[in-house]
């Protein structure tokens, strides 16, 4: 039994098909079938029930699946550590971040980092905070930028932004000249929301329900600039972070502080507590922490 046997076994179990596993791994189906058969003979057990083209794990197969995942994870961690030793200052970092902050301060941070580590490459994945947390959780991303809260049992984190949400309306809106606005005043308004895979979707929905109403959502999007454009076309209202509002055209939209309640928008960088981070990822975290982190932002209260 070797790592290749376990890799083939896990892929067949995941896809429930020898054919699909062979396509995924770019090897012939007979090769995979032979590997699995050899593994079963070596262990003296059946790992799969064969039912035509569909395969299912046996009870022994389920136990094997759990253990094989841990073995592969440990092997990958070992490989990463050895690569660090052999290839210092080289690597690839996968970062997930919400679309609304991608063009903000991160190009500057990445640019400065590249001056010191020119051989480190990056994959930037723009998505809502919920999906970013899932990506860091399942290992498809190394590091994530998310809207808090994040699961403190799973992730390390440090806070980089502490702001609140602001109301954005058309200049002709009845509230356009107000100094501040209470959330309950918006109960009859058409809302333009972020999608459900954004933390702000659930955050705003929860606060509206607490204020005594369920918001009338006419559009959902993943892009903050779409929200501002829809508001400027007088098609609805939006709630956006202060950082975004500072860049909006005051001739097209009006920004009003939202009070009672104040809805926080806190951004943090997260990474898994139980997963090995490559040299490149650790170096980027340290660089970003020195660049963006303010210890006061992580203080309680």
From Swiss-Prot:
One GO term of the biological process aspect: regulation of DNA-templated transcription
GO cellular component annotations of the record: cytosol
The keyword Transcription is annotated on this UniProt entry: yes
Keywords: DNA-binding, Transcription, Transcription regulation
Portion annotated as DNA-binding: 18-37
Molecular-function GO terms, alphabetical: DNA-binding transcription factor activity; sequence-specific DNA binding
Pfam family, one: LysR_substrate
Highest taxon listed in the record's lineage: Bacteria
KW Transcription regulation (keyword) present: yes
SUPFAM superfamilies, per database record: Periplasmic binding protein-like II (SSF53850), Winged helix' DNA-binding domain (SSF46785)
Residue span(s) of domain HTH lysR-type: 1-58
Family: Belongs to the LysR transcriptional regulatory family.
Name the UniProt record assigns to this protein: Uncharacterized HTH-type transcriptional regulator YwbI
Species whose genome carries this gene: Bacillus subtilis (strain 168)
Encoding gene, per UniProt annotation: ywbI
